[in-house]
Design a protein with these regions (language model features):
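Conserved AMP-binding/adenylate-forming core of the ANL superfamily
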Residues: 7-10, 18, 26-71, 75-79, ...
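Conserved ATP/PPi-binding loop(s) of AMP-dependent carboxylate-activating enzymes
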Residues: 329-333, 344-378, 416
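Conserved AMP-binding/adenylation subdomain of ANL enzymes
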Residues: 181-199, 207-248, 262-263
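Conserved pre-ATP/AMP-binding loop-to-beta segment of ANL
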Residues: 10, 25-26, 144-162, 168-169, ...
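AMP-binding/adenylate-forming catalytic core of the ANL superfamily
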Residues: 95, 112-114, 249, 362, ...
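Structural core segment of the AMP-binding/adenylate-forming
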Residues: 55-56, 83-152, 456-458
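Conserved beta-loop-beta connector loops within the AMP-binding
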Residues: 337-359, 395-396, 458-462, 497
Length: 509
């Protein structure tokens, strides 16, 4: 074996666009308003961008930051960076200049590509970091396209996704070409798949791993059409879905809640005829799932994943059985298990049916955090990735997510899982959205608090909510404090920012 020559295996995420452009060049890849691009046209634009990046000195492995909403130029820039051999560093569009600068500095990015809609943040970030900037609406438009993409190896970094920073400053999760090509392939062809002829709504932010991997890459892997919505608006989404004949939507729970509200508020707009819906990014309340399925006459297949797992690792799959309230079974080539959360330094499994920390291994697990070996060692143990989520796995392998370990509330010595309380409160007819948190309490250590956004036209009373909850939840679980608010704080991917609520209500602000 030692005498065998080393043969390099090549793989690039850019092939997710290059291959359909070669096989079905005239198929429609992207729609944005009146614009329509075929796969061949999209790939040509990406290769022009790649050629300009190479001319501007980008070398294989160089990080290139990308700050843009869901527009066609995001997609062509994304695959252009990959085609040049670069590593994409997506920057959330909701960040301010200083926040964007931190990500650019941390990733050691050599260039910043931006859309004019976020020029102010880009200009400030560039001023603080010194990186050259490029307007993606004009960059490379006159360049001679590269013939093909620069080859990379499977374990080379492809994208660095920054986590939401729930435990401090954001960390850059390194996803390799193998991670993301496999995740796109498994999402497109296994589980429930992406059927040929799919027209998908691109409403998930493409700077987020869910939008990139499940909407964009998985869709392109099966030559789907992606209809881009630059910024999510529920009423506009209904109109787009009807106009373009959208058959599939991937969304986070907040979006499903807003779509239901938009249907109720706009009876003049027909309910779109969807064939499939996918939910991820956060736990979907069963009450919302049931209402959406009844209203839109389609199933929601809820799945589970994280930035560090590329992201998809489980899904409710028809051939394995769909169950509301669960996130289904592991996807092809991925192992899921439950570990003892009280043993943080190594992996100890717990029996089926017992609560513990969800752990993952397989092709989806990331390569580590960029320039942060200590944080990497904390989560990668004995070939497993520790997710930080509490779950239960039954004998068949079906997984239920109970909550984040960091969201657990300990009231008077009893563990209370906020998701269980939220599921109960979402059954109240006057509740549109709810976040349950723990706040400091002198007697019990922590007290249960529900922060509620009422349904349109509902007049909620905190005492009434407490009394209603008391009849449906154990004495240690029902909220003793209720706040009625106009909206919940949302992060760039539209997840509820519970850390902000804890800070606000723990300090009495």
């Amino acid at each position: 074996m030692s005498d065998m020559p080393y043969v390099s295996t090549t793989l690039s995420l850019a092939s997710v666009l290059a291959e359909p452009a070669r096989r079905e060049p005239d198929a429609i890849a992207l729609v944005q308003g009146e614009q329509r691009l075929t796969y061949a046209e999209t790939w040509q634009r990406a290769r022009r961008t790649a050629a300009q990046l190479v001319a501007d000195g980008v070398q294989p492995g160089d990080r290139v930051a990308l700050l843009a909403p869901n527009v066609i130029e995001f997609v062509t820039s994304y695959y252009g960076i990959l085609a040049a051999g670069g590593v994409v560093v997506p920057i959330p569009t909701l960040l301010q200049g200083r926040e964007a600068a931190y990500l650019i500095d941390t990733a050691e990015a050599s260039h910043l590509m931006y859309h004019p809609a976020v020029a102010a943040a880009a200009t400030k970030a560039a001023g603080m970091t010194g990186v050259p900037t490029h307007d993606i609406t004009t960059y490379g438009t006159d360049a001679e396209p590269l013939t093909t993409f620069v080859t990379r190896e499977p374990l080379d970094p492809a994208v660095i996704f920054f986590t939401s920073g729930t435990t401090g400053r954001p960390k850059g999760a390194i996803l390799t070409h193998l991670n993301l090509v496999m995740n796109a392939t498994v999402s497109a062809f296994d589980g429930n798949g992406v059927p040929p002829g799919t027209i998908a709504l691109g409403c998930l932010p493409l700077f987020h791993v869910f939008g990139q991997s499940v909407s964009l890459n998985a869709g392109f892997r099966h030559t789907a059409t992606l209809v881009l919505q630059p910024r999510f608006d529920a009423r506009e989404a209904l109109e787009i879905m009807n106009r373009e004949g959208v058959t599939m939507i991937c969304a986070v729970p907040t979006m499903y809640i807003q779509l239901l509200a938009a249907v109720a508020e706009n009876p003049d707009i027909p309910v779109p005829q969807l064939e499939d819906a996918v939910s991820g990014g956060a736990s979907l309340p069963v009450a919302v799932l049931e209402r959406f399925e009844a209203t839109f006459s389609t199933k929601i297949h809820e799945g589970y994943g994280l930035s560090e797992t590329s992201p998809s690792i489980t899904s409710n799959q028809e051939q394995l059985g769909v169950e509301a309230g669960s996130v289904g079974h592991s996807l092809w080539g991925i192992d899921i298990a439950i570990a003892d959360v009280t043993v943080p330094d190594h992996i100890e499994f717990v029996p089926a049916g017992e609560r513990g920390e969800v752990i993952v291994r397989g092709h989806a697990v990331f390569a580590g955090y960029w320039n942060n070996e200590a944080a990497t060692r904390e989560v990668l143990q004995d070939s497993w990735f520790r997710t930080g989520d509490i779950g239960i796995q039954d004998e068949s392998g079906r997984l239920r997510i109970v909550d984040r370990t960091k969201d657990l509330v300990i009231r008077g010595g009893y563990n209370v899982y906020p998701r269980e309380v939220e599921e109960a409160l979402m059954r109240h007819e006057g509740v549109d959205q709810v976040a349950v948190i723990g706040v400091p309490d002198e007697q019990y250590g922590e007290e249960i608090m529900a922060v509620i956004v009422p349904s349109e036209g509902a007049r909620l009373d905190g005492d009434e909510i407490i009394a209603w909850s008391r009849e449906r939840l154990g004495s240690h679980k029902y909220p003793r404090r209720v706040e009625i608010v106009g909206e919940l704080p949302l992060g760039p991917s539209m997840k509820v920012l519970k850390r902000e609520l804890r800070t606000q209500y723990s300090t009495g602000e």
